[in-house]
Amino acid sequence: ARVAATEARFDQLAAGTRTIVVNHFPLRADLAVLPRIPRFTIWCGTTRTADWHTRYRADVVVSGHLHMRSTRWRDGVRFEEVSLGYPAQWQQSKTVDDYLRPILPAPPPVAGWGEDATVLRHW
């Protein structure tokens, strides 16, 4: 029911409207992969959202469930996992500002980042 309600809201946007999609869970299963244990999935979602980034013309997709800060690219769209992590992972010498990063305007691309690139963020 929640997916259908959100799709109905997206469908009301004027043609060509760019979006910023924000969701607690990642929209795609391929974004919920533990690099050290790739056979184990931490996916908690639905495949019905897998194409929202292209179907609803997202400039960026933001989520935070995984507790693994990262920047990933899929289909030319940037996906930001912006969790602050668990308190035990916080470095006491840093402030919350040290953990923040720009969403828009988009930061400049990093050389070598191409389609399906992943950069895990360790602060």
Regions found by a protein language model. Give the residues of each.
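Active-site-proximal loop/helix segment associated with metal-binding centers of metalloenzymes
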Residues: A1-I20, F25-R36, G114-R121
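Binuclear metal-dependent phosphoesterase catalytic core
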Residues: V33, F40-I42, T46-D59, H67-W123
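Hydrophobic "anchor" residues on beta-strands that sit immediately upstream
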Residues: I20, V60-V61
